[in-house]
Amino acid sequence: MKTKELNLESHPETGIKYDVGKLRFDLLPVKPLEAVAAIYTYGADKYADNNWRGGLTWGRVFGASMRHLWAFWRGEDVDSESGLPHLAHAAFGLLTLLEYQETHPELDDRIKDG
C-alpha cells in the first residue's frame, strides 16, 4: 500500500498526526456505501440482524451477485423486490465473499481446476 508522506511544513499551524501507512477510510465514497448499508438493513428486516454471518455456500452468494450484475448490465438499475440498486446488492455479495474467505472457508464450493 502506497501513501503520501506527511509533510509537516505545509500545515505548520495545525496539530501533528502521524498516520502514514494507515488505511484512508476518508477516501471511501459515501453514497455507494449508504446504498450497501441499505442492503444490509433490508436483509436484517427480511431475515434477522447479521443473518448472513451464519454462512451460506459461496456459490449461492456468487450466484445472487451475478444475477444482480446481469440485471444491471441489461439496463435495470433497481431490484423490483427490494427497490434498491442492483449494484448495491452485488456489492453486498462481494463483501460477504470477502468476509467468508476469512470466516467460512468450509463453505467454499467453487469448482477448482487442476
Question: PLM ranges: what are they?
Answer:
Residues M1-G114:
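Intrinsically disordered, low-complexity regulatory regions
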